[in-house]
């Protein structure tokens, strides 16, 4: 992929996460977006931030204790630490926090 294609894919991924959160219509989750960022907040105030890092062509995911950097590999965003796939990992974090299954795919 070219740099331009990667940047487009970065934006499309964030838009897709936003669309899927919006479609869930879950009272226990709230989210806000701004240019290159999706901020997800649970009922108890815990925040998860998914952000575009254009300079490094990465997506970063942060939660109160940890943070992960995701690189594009074979059309998927894979974390550089534990090889987590972005959507599955975000689903797992939110599901664990809320105590119920969350699906973003």
Curated annotation (Swiss-Prot):
Alphabetical list of HAMAP family matching this protein: CyaY
Family named by the database record: Belongs to the frataxin family.
Coiled-coil residue windows: none
Any single GO BP term: intracellular iron ion homeostasis
Role summary: Involved in iron-sulfur (Fe-S) cluster assembly. May act as a regulator of Fe-S biogenesis.
Molecular function in Gene Ontology: 2 iron, 2 sulfur cluster binding; ferric iron binding; ferrous iron binding; ferroxidase activity; iron chaperone activity
Species this chain originates from: Chloroherpeton thalassium (strain ATCC 35110 / GB-78)
A Gene Ontology cellular-component term: cytoplasm
Keyword list, A-Z: Iron, Metal-binding
Protein name: Iron-sulfur cluster assembly protein CyaY
């Amino acid at each position: 992929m070219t740099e331009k294609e990667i940047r487009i894919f970065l934006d499309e991924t964030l838009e897709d996460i936003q669309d899927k959160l919006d479609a869930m219509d879950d009272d226990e989750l709230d989210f806000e977006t701004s240019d290159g960022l999706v901020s997800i907040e649970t009922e108890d105030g815990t925040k998860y931030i998914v952000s575009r890092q254009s300079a490094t062509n990465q997506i970063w995911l942060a939660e109160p204790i940890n943070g992960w950097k995701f690189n594009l590999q074979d059309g998927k965003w894979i974390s550089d630490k534990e090889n987590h796939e972005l959507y599955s990992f975000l689903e797992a974090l939110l599901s664990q926090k809320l105590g119920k299954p969350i699906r973003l795919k």
